[in-house]
Amino acid sequence: MLASTRHIARGDTGNVSVRIRRVTTTRAGGVSAPPFDTFNLGDHVGDDPAAVAANRARLAAAIGLPGNRVVWMNQVHGDRVELVDQPRNTALDDTDGLVTATPRLALAVVTADCVPVLMADARAGIAAAVHAGRAGAQRGVVVRALEVMLSLGAQVRDISALLGPAVSGRNYEVPAAMADEVEAALPGSRTTTAAGTPGVDLRAGIACQLRDLGVESIDVDPRCTVADPTLFSHRRDAPTGRFASLVWME
């Protein structure tokens, strides 16, 4: 069991028809052995499956939900978004975004540098979780998730978004041609790293994208996965684990 929920950062948004809960874990408080120590929640990185299952059970208990009410994805850096409306015992394959209108159904994203995007409309009672890496963000996975939310009755003016911990532009060096390519698909993302080289700030680009689509309530977790040792980072430590970001409604 977790010693306490101090390993989990919580945030609430809105109280119109439902309460929105958002959680981001750290790497502390689990049972995984190095290099996945200790609260690894990714089941695709080479960790002991029993350890991952134990960590996921701890997470579900810590947020007060049965294990099958935490919905996971087998993420592939694509743009597929799935609507979920009931508990699941297995992850959704080849999926990078989840949307639900069902209360007490937590949508989970696992990352170690990519951007976890947690969106919700508390008035309409609709939530979404998106895994937005460079490739998925370029393909429009965040836009796809927003479109599904709107199709269910969400209103752009009522949607709040949290962009969770991810690699910062200061630490995300890429070739100049790649930075230009990402900028073309995601304006506002091209930047310069701390070393003065071409870089990408995915969260800046996604925030610009959401604002252009009419989303005004956007919060960005300031933590950089590469710089913060309490978080998993593939760029810094590969092989390593994954932390989770979740959103659900009560």
Curated annotation (Swiss-Prot):
Keyword Transferase found: yes
InterPro entries in UniProt: Cu_polyphenol_OxRdtase, Cu_polyphenol_OxRdtase_sf, Cytotoxic_necrot_fac-like_cat
A Pfam family assignment: Cu-oxidase_4
Record EC number: 2.4.2.1, 3.5.4.4, 2.4.2.28
Protein name: Purine nucleoside phosphorylase Rv2149c
UniProt KW Zinc keyword: yes
Coiled-coil ranges per UniProt: none
Listed GO MF terms: adenosine deaminase activity; copper ion binding; oxidoreductase activity; S-methyl-5-thioadenosine phosphorylase activity
Residues given in the record as Zn(2+) binding sites: H77, C114, H131
Reactions it catalyzes: adenosine + phosphate = alpha-D-ribose 1-phosphate + adenine; S-methyl-5'-thioadenosine + phosphate = 5-(methylsulfanyl)-alpha-D-ribose 1-phosphate + adenine; inosine + phosphate = alpha-D-ribose 1-phosphate + hypoxanthine; adenosine + H2O + H(+) = inosine + NH4(+)
Function statement: Purine nucleoside enzyme that catalyzes the phosphorolysis of adenosine and inosine nucleosides, yielding D-ribose 1-phosphate and the respective free bases, adenine and hypoxanthine. Also catalyzes the phosphorolysis of S-methyl-5'-thioadenosine into adenine and S-methyl-5-thio-alpha-D-ribose 1-phosphate. Also has adenosine deaminase activity.
Similarity comment: Belongs to the purine nucleoside phosphorylase YfiH/LACC1 family.
Subunit structure: Homodimer.
PANTHER family: PURINE NUCLEOSIDE PHOSPHORYLASE LACC1, UNCHARACTERIZED PROTEIN YFIH
Cofactor(s) annotated in UniProt: Cu(2+); Zn(2+)
Organism whose genome encodes this protein: Mycobacterium tuberculosis (strain ATCC 25618 / H37Rv)
Keywords, in A-Z order: Copper, Hydrolase, Metal-binding, Oxidoreductase, Transferase, Zinc
GO CC entries: peptidoglycan-based cell wall
